[in-house]
Amino acid sequence: VRTPAEIRDEYIDSLNHIRSAYGKICGQVGRGHLLSFPDIHKLSEGLFLSALTYWEALCRDLIVTDLATVSAGVLRSEIREFRTKNAPYRLAERMLNHPDHPEKFVEWSSFESVVSRANEFLGQNHRYVLTQVEKQDLAKIKKVRNAIAHKSDKAWESFSALIRGDPFNLTGAQCRGVTPGRFIYAHQWNGATVMEKSLTTLENAARTLVP
């Protein structure tokens, strides 16, 4: 069983691997190199999704660990002794999963959903507290993720509104032909590429949850 610090460190290691891979492929783009711009856009989408998938796993694994170990949580406050060492972790996972799991699942990509479950199962003094700016940035990242993962009209409309609004402010001409991968690779977010800023935001959030 991993500690919260181990869960955080494994996640940050994953982000560092993604950063390294992204840096390498960015150096192989254009004339005379291995990758075309459409190639780098698709690869950027894949790495971006990987970072978000690991983030979802971090949130899920952290809250399961907290529910299994924190005395103020509903599990430990109701049950003093367990038959086996790992029983609280198995019970915590079942309690936090969707009732119809695995056919349906909790949307761990939504931090608000994580906070809601923490409030319900862990009480008010839990670790799942981020600044308003951090939560807004995670919401932006989630919209990009949804545009890659879902391909639905709703996801695309949300993505289009995002890139036209602050802080990206893409013009109509810039939006023409844009894809999530092209946006991640080619556009800036507070002085860094969208990919770089997103990875930094996710790492900072992980360090806030587990100092």
Q: What label would you give each PLM region?
A:
Residues 2-27, 133-136, 144, 150-211:
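Polyanionic, low-complexity intrinsically disordered segments
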Residues 24-35, 40:
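Short, Lys/Arg-rich flexible segments
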Residues 34, 40-144:
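Helix-loop junctions and short alpha-helical segments
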